[in-house]
């Protein structure tokens, strides 16, 4: 009797362990680490939205996957950088719309140790040529900082300009200009894309490409007034009025529909019902094994009363 309950306990613990998600200690980034109540400084007026469909190899299933993210751009703060990124978006649109839309090249070159995702060159210009073109990073506005996951910034290297998407609060080394924020799909970005398999230099083992891209410009009628209101909200926040700040809660998903789909999935795939079903089956076998003589003896004692 005692040995049976010991086996039952071991089976229960094994089911619980296998049903739990994998630990995230070895992940570069994880949305589980986010404090969804934390207030960050307000964002500037939005001048553009960019939707990017990213195709990559899922680090858990090793199958090809696609995720859609939305990036808000802040043209009232860094107009030159935003203009350069929009030109890059247009070039990718043209590439995807052409007959030879398939491209074996990588649209994302590297995953940094802190989980930041480095895009390929925005311009193919050399560093000398880039010096004569907008944006000149040292002359741009640097008041936006890398203080939250989802920040999008532009850097310069010997290959020209590149954009980087942050997945943590760790500041970037070197000079960069923050020009946008991921405002939808941040969860997939942190949990999936930032944790793809890479070599020792951070290069993804399988190419990460852009399968879809679109952009929309928001024409602000009173841009100067909107920017001044933002500066006032920012000043209030810096003076201690945290109500003027924002959280990242709404940035994790692609919208309420996505949240609903996730909720339905979790209800259907939650491990607890499976665990309880397994325990119920074990208990049923136990009852049958213990009381089998009584159960089967009763059935054998049934006598026919039919008259000959």
UniProtKB/Swiss-Prot annotation:
It catalyses: [protein]-peptidylproline (omega=180) = [protein]-peptidylproline (omega=0). InterPro entries: Cyclophilin-like_dom_sf, Cyclophilin-type_PPIase_dom. One of its GO terms (molecular function) is cyclosporin A binding. The keyword Isomerase applies. Its EC number is 5.2.1.8. Keywords: Isomerase, Rotamase. GO terms for biological process: protein folding. The keyword Oxidoreductase does not apply. It is an enzyme of class 5 (isomerase). Residues 56-215 form the PPIase cyclophilin-type domain. It comes from the Eukaryota. GO terms for cellular component: cytoplasm; endoplasmic reticulum; fungal-type vacuole. Pfam families: Pro_isomerase. PPIases accelerate the folding of proteins. It catalyzes the cis-trans isomerization of proline imidic peptide bonds in oligopeptides. PANTHER family: PEPTIDYL-PROLYL CIS-TRANS ISOMERASE (PTHR11071), PEPTIDYL-PROLYL CIS-TRANS ISOMERASE CPR4-RELATED (PTHR11071:SF568). This is Peptidyl-prolyl cis-trans isomerase CYP8.
């Amino acid at each position: 009797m005692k040995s049976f309950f010991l086996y039952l306990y071991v089976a229960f613990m094994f089911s619980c362990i296998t049903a739990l998600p994998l630990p995230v200690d070895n992940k570069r980034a994880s949305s589980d680490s986010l404090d969804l109540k934390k207030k960050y400084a307000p964002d500037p007026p939005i001048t553009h939205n960019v939707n990017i469909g990213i195709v990559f190899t899922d680090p858990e299933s090793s199958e090809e996957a696609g995720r859609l993210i939305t990036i808000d751009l802040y043209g009232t703060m860094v107009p030159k950088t935003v203009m350069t990124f929009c030109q890059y978006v247009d070039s990718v649109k043209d590439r995807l719309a052409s007959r030879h839309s398939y491209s074996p090249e990588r649209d994302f070159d590297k995953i940094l140790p802190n989980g930041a995702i480095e895009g390929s060159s925005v311009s193919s210009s050399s560093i000398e040529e880039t010096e004569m073109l907008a944006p000149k990073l040292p002359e741009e506005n640097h008041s936006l900082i890398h203080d939250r996951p989802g920040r999008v910034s532009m850097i310069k290297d010997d290959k020209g300009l590149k954009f980087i998407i942050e997945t943590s609060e760790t500041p970037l080394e070197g000079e960069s200009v923050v020009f946008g924020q991921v405002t939808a799909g941040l969860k997939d970005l942190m949990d999936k894309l930032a944790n793809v398999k890479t070599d020792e230099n951070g290069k993804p083992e399988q190419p990460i490409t852009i399968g879809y891209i679109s952009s929309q410009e928001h024409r602000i009628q009173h841009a100067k007034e909107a920017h001044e209101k933002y500066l006032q909200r920012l000043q209030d926040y810096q003076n201690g009025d945290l109500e003027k700040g924002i959280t990242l809660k709404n940035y994790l998903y692609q919208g309420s529909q996505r949240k609903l789909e996730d909720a339905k999935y979790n209800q259907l795939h939650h491990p607890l019902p499976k665990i309880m079903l397994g325990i119920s089956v074990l208990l049923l076998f136990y009852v049958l094994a213990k009381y089998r003589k009584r159960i089967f003896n009763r059935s054998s004692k049934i006598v026919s009363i039919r008259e000959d």
